[in-house]
UniProtKB/Swiss-Prot annotation:
Belongs to the pyridoxamine 5'-phosphate oxidase family. InterPro entries: Pyridox_Oxase, Pyridox_Oxase_CS, Pyridox_Oxase_N, Pyridoxamine_oxidase_dimer_C, Split_barrel_FMN-bd. Substrate binds at K64, Y121, R125, R189, L190, H191. Pfam families: PNP_phzG_C, PNPOx_N. Its cofactor is FMN. This is Pyridoxine/pyridoxamine 5'-phosphate oxidase.
């Protein structure tokens, strides 16, 4: 590693994040930094679930909101992720911000957002994306791209004028954290890691520093 790289990392870690006591506040700080430094989708997160056989699944989704109740994303209820979350409402998230040499891991319980929340968010989506949500049978076999484009055209014709309502099979989920882990790269793999954990959302956080 060059002296320049080491100096850059030293600048990134000039504030001791391991002194933080509130994981949500620390996430907010890091996410604000990511919004300034990441070129593409700082709200992108890996979502891990398991199927009924216990086989893990992971995919990238976009976080559409967060607060102390949890982290929210949206998709089709009948999708692979939707079916897996219905069978086992627990999940893990990973945010990786390469430009900052940071990552945040989150594990917790999953619950559905309210109908009002889903409606309100769906109304903010571009109309073409709303139409796509109606046309797509996410995770189901697709005969051809042409078949999908035909389905899109039919939905577009149906909603040529006026607002597009939210499909009944499209909604969102909230992951309420029971565990956070904040990781920051250091020179020579001597990284900093801290974990916040609790058994239930009503309990206070327990902070632990971890070996890299």
């Amino acid at each position: 590693m060059s002296d320049t790289s080491i100096q850059q990392q030293s600048q990134l870690t000039s504030g001791d994040f391991t002194a933080a006591e509130n994981p949500f506040a620390l996430f907010a700080e890091w996410f604000a930094d990511a919004n300034e430094s990441e070129l593409n989708d700082p709200n992108a997160m890996a979502l891990a679930t398991v199927d009924p056989d216990g086989l893990p699944d992971v995919r990238m989704v976009l976080m559409k909101g967060y607060d102390t109740d949890g982290f929210v994303f949206y998709s089709h209820i009948a999708s692979q992720k939707g079916r897996e979350l219905a069978a086992n409402p627990k999940a893990a998230l990973l945010f990786h911000w390469k430009s900052l040499r940071r990552q945040v891991r989150i594990r917790g319980a999953v619950s559905a957002v309210t109908e009002t929340e889903a409606d309100d968010y769906f109304a903010t989506r571009p109309k073409q994306a709303q139409i796509g949500a109606w046309a797509s049978k996410q995770s189901q076999p697709l005969e051809s791209r042409f078949a999908f484009e035909q389905a899109i055209a039919k939905v577009a014709a149906r909603y040529l004028v006026g607002e597009v309502p939210r499909p009944p099979g499209w909604s969102g989920w909230r992951i309420t954290p029971l565990r956070f882990e904040f990781w920051h790269d250091r020179p020579f793999r001597l990284h900093d890691r801290i974990e916040f954990s609790r058994d239930t959302p009503a309990q206070p956080w327990i902070k632990t520093r971890l070996y890299p």
